[in-house]
From Swiss-Prot:
It comes from the Eukaryota. The keyword Repeat applies. This is WD repeat-containing protein 5 homolog. Pfam families: Beta-prop_WDR5 (PF25175). The keyword Manganese does not apply.
Length: 335
C-alpha cells in the first residue's frame, strides 16, 4: 500500500536449521544461484494484489486484493478454487492458521475477518481498530491473532472468542507490519515512525526498540524462521537483518531493489539455499543470497510494482502479486 492512507557465518547456519530435513548423503548440493522460471499467471482479481501466502501444508495459495476479496488457488497447479467475500473495503494482508484451515484478513474497513477456507464462510469479524488494519499474523498455536493498524495500535485477539485480549499503543505513526516469532512468545511491529519494536505476547510489555537510520519509515517486518532475527524493510530501498536481543545490531543490509513508496513484502526462502526474496517498485522480484548479500536472481514478468511475495513451505516455489496495471498472481518454480 502507498505510504500516506557482525558476520553471520555462525548465526545463519542455525537460522535455517529448524527448516532443514535430514537429507540422504547422495543428495545434490545446494545451488549457489537459484534458477526460478515463471510457471503460472493467475488472473481473476479486479484490483491490485496486496498479499499472497502459501498454506502451511503447502496445498494452497491465498491472494488478497484491493478488490475486497481473497482467492484460493492450488499451490502446485495454479487452479482457482474459491473466492472469500465479505469485506467492505480493500484487504491489505492475510495469514493462515497452522492447520491450514483458517485465514485471517486485514482490511481498510477497519476489521479483521476469520474465514473457514474449506467452506469459504466467514467465521468471525474482529472489531476495535479505529483506522485501516494493515497487517495480521496468527501465532503458531493459532489461538491468537496479532493485528497492526493505521490507528498506531497493535491488538492481540482470541481466535475462539473474537475478543481483543490486548491493546498496545505501539507507535506514533501507522503500523505497517506485525508478526509472531516461532514459539508465539514475541510480537514484532514496524511503523512509519521509523522504529521496529519487540513485544511480550502475554503482557504486552515493550521489550526492545530498534530505530532505523535517519528515522526512515519501516515498511515491512518479519521474524526469521528461528525467531532470533528480524528482517525489516525501509522506504530507502533497503532491507536489513537485525539481532534484537541486547545489542540490537544490524547484521546484514540488502540493497538493489527499489522501495521508496509502498509497503512491500519480503520473505525468507528456506527450501533451496539461503535466500531473501522481495518485491520491488521496478516490477521485478529480487532474490538475495542471505550470507553474501548479493543479488543472485531477478524475476521479470509483472507489469507493475511487485507488492507481495511468498515462498512455499517445502517446495522451491515462489508466488508474487502486483499492483493495479498488472493485477496478476504469478507462480515461479525452480528448475
Amino acid at each position: 500500500m502507498e505510504s500516506g492512507p557482525a558476520s553471520m557465518s555462525s548465526s545463519s547456519s542455525y537460522l535455517y536449521q529448524e527448516q532443514q530435513q535430514q537429507q540422504p548423503q547422495q543428495t545434490e548440493s545446494i545451488p549457489q544461484t537459484p534458477n526460478y522460471i515463471l510457471k503460472y499467471t493467475l488472473k481473476g482479481h479486479l484490483k491490485s494484489i496486496s498479499s499472497v501466502k502459501f498454506s502451511p501444508d503447502g496445498k494452497w495459495l491465498a491472494s488478497a486484493s484491493a478488490d475486497k476479496t481473497i482467492k484460493i488457488w492450488g499451490a502446485y497447479d495454479g487452479k482457482f478454487e474459491r473466492t472469500l467475500e465479505g469485506h467492505k473495503e480493500g484487504i491489505s494482508d492475510i495469514a493462515w492458521s497452522q492447520d491450514s484451515k483458517l485465514i485471517c484478513s486485514a482490511s481498510d474497513d477497519k476489521t479483521i475477518k476469520i474465514w473457514d477456507v474449506e467452506s469459504g464462510k466467514m467465521v468471525k469479524t474482529l472489531k476495535g481498530h479505529k483506522e485501516y488494519v494493515f497487517g495480521v499474523s496468527f501465532n503458531p498455536q493459532s489461538n491468537l491473532i496479532v493485528s497492526g493498524s493505521f490507528d498506531e495500535n497493535v491488538r492481540i485477539w482470541d481466535v475462539n472468542t473474537g475478543e481483543c485480549t490486548k491493546m498496545i499503543s505501539a507507535h506514533s505513526d501507522p503500523v505497517t507490519g506485525v508478526h509472531f516469532n516461532r514459539d508465539g512468545t514475541l510480537v514484532v511491529s514496524g511503523s512509519y515512525d521509523g522504529t521496529v519494536r519487540i513485544w511480550d505476547t502475554t503482557t504486552g510489555q515493550l521489550l526492545n526498540t530498534i530505530s532505523t537510520e535517519d528515522g526512515k519509515e519501516v515498511s515491512f517486518v518479519k521474524f526469521s524462521p528461528n525467531g532470533k532475527f528480524v528482517l525489516a524493510g525501509t522506504l530507502d530501498n533497503t532491507l536489513r537483518l537485525w539481532s534484537y536481543n541486547n545489542n540490537k545490531k544490524c547484521l546484514k543490509t540488502y540493497t538493489g531493489h527499489k522501495n521508496e513508496k509502498y509497503c512491500i513484502f519480503s520473505t525468507f526462502s528456506v527450501t533451496c539455499g539461503k535466500w531473501i526474496v522481495t518485491g520491488s517498485e521496478d516490477n521485478l522480484i529480487y532474490i538475495y543470497n542471505l550470507q553474501t548479500r548479493e543479488i543472485v536472481q531477478t524475476l521479470a514478468g509483472h507489469e507493475d510494482v511487485v507488492l507481495t511475495v511468498a515462498c512455499h513451505p517445502t517446495e522451491n516455489i515462489i508466488a508474487s502479486g502486483a499492483l493495479e496495471k498488472d493485477r496478476s498472481v504469478k507462480i515461479w518454480k525452480h528448475m
